[in-house]
A protein has these predicted regions:
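Accessory, non-ATPase domains that flank or precede helicase/AAA+ motor cores in DNA-metabolism machines
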Residues: 1-191, 195-207
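Conserved phosphotransfer active-site motifs of two-component signaling proteins
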Residues: 210
Length: 212
């Protein structure tokens, strides 16, 4: 590839290297899906009494390593996301990783931007169907190496290679897209419950119209 790019033969390149004119080396370059984003940072907001009550209940489960389930009930714009953000910050502060699942249709740039504004790009990995194969590989590698402590994605993100899971959040938990009809068929809730039990961590389900 280099020979074609420079339009020279391999022998010429080796001669230049031998005489010290050039140097060959390998370097990993991450394909970053956030590369063009410039987002102002944001500070956490004061929680209302209801939000604080919900936060405190989940925080206790995180501190006690309890495999518990919580339903955060509220319509769009009621402040569920701020509770998510502060719970993720709690998990981040104890050195563990959070998984934030959202329906594919809701995984908009605006959704991701809010998390980047709070936590920065370096701590976040994103997994969804619109990533290139290379981008997906790099995000997966970032998670496996422990560089990303916040994983945001659609249903397949539940299979991310996390070794220090601290919290699972499933937003819009009633959404039918959390059930995969393709082989292998699976329900994100079932997989989440299994992982939460294995790691002794809580799951937060968020919805305005909870699945019965």
């Amino acid at each position: 590839d280099l020979e074609n790019f420079a339009d020279v033969s391999t022998s010429i390149l080796k001669t230049l290297e031998k005489n010290g004119y050039i140097k060959f080396y390998e370097q990993t370059v991450e394909r970053n899906p956030f590369i063009h984003k410039v987002i102002d940072s944001s500070s956490k907001l004061n929680l209302t009494d209801e939000q604080k009550s919900a936060y405190d209940a989940v925080e206790e489960a995180i501190d006690d390593c309890m495999n518990s389930e919580f339903l955060l009930f509220g319509v769009t714009g009621s402040g569920k996301t701020e509770v998510y953000l502060q719970l993720i910050e709690k998990v981040l502060n104890i050195g563990k990783t959070s998984v934030m699942l959202v329906p594919e249709i809701s995984l908009t740039p605006q959704t991701v931007d809010r998390f980047i504004a709070r936590f920065g790009q370096d701590k976040i990995a994103i997994l969804h169907s619109k990533l290139s194969v290379g981008e997906r590989y790099d995000q997966w590698y970032k998670i496996k190496n422990g560089e990303a402590k916040i994983v945001i994605g659609a249903r397949s993100a539940i299979f991310a290679p996390i070794s220090d899971l601290g919290l699972i959040i499933i937003d819009e938990e009633h959404d039918s897209s959390y059930k995969s009809e393709m082989i292998p068929r699976y329900n994100v809730k079932d997989v989440s419950r299994y992982l939460a039990k294995e790691y002794n961590v809580p799951i937060v389900f968020g919805s305005a119209t909870p699945d019965m």
